[in-house]
Amino acid sequence: MASRVSPRWRIEDLSFSQLATSAARDDENLFYLATCASFIESGADLYTGNLVNYFRDDEEVFGWRRDHWEPEELQHGEALRSYVAHAWPDFDWESAYRSFLAEYANYCKVELLAPTRALEMAARCVVETGTATNYTALARCATEPVLQDLASRIAADEINHYKHFYRFFRRYREAESVGRTRVLVTLGRRTLELRIEDAPRAIRHAAKSRCPACAGDRAYLRSVGAGMRAAVRKNLHPGTTLKMLMRPLALPRPVQAVVQYPIEKFIDNVFLR
């Protein structure tokens, strides 16, 4: 069995000793952006294990996921957790994360994967587009240099993951003869799921520890979520997100020109709001 390959960077490369705590400590939006990301990334083994098993008999996909993708995803969680611990040392991360994980585990089941491997690869392209978008935006909006560095590193990893998933998708699309309509439905459904699933759960569980009196206040939680989405929306290039999402459709250029506007509006109203 092949040994796992070291990630492209290490947590030790991050300069936590130079963290500008004054720039982070009182920034409520930054706290939730970093903490929610740390929860979701730290739970990566729940879904990476399912995906590794789903492609177990494909040596190339299985090996890459096991030796590269999974360790890199888990390192993202460890690095973000370390950042939260340095920036907000009074926050009980472990307790809040355990509470989040108990709920999150219900949404990381193998039966929730797409019905074919090509469509699951298309769904992964959506997820990697979302994570690359979020971390690129976080790197731009963060006022604290260490988080800027960390978010930039994670964004680069996610873009690299997207490239692999897209390559695997093309191979499976050819083998399964999956049409554009099924791919489009998968892309749309997974985009909608991104809008409603992970972040709201993470916000609730972070708030329970950060601001117990606010945890049951729906208006407060909605405000936090809106602030996070606004930070992303103001600090990204929608054109890049659009190209990444549309790429699996392999549309001819004239058709792409026709459908680009409605897809762009869909992304703006669902993916970025």
Listing of model-derived features with the role each one plays in the protein:
Residues 1-273:
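Non-heme di-metal
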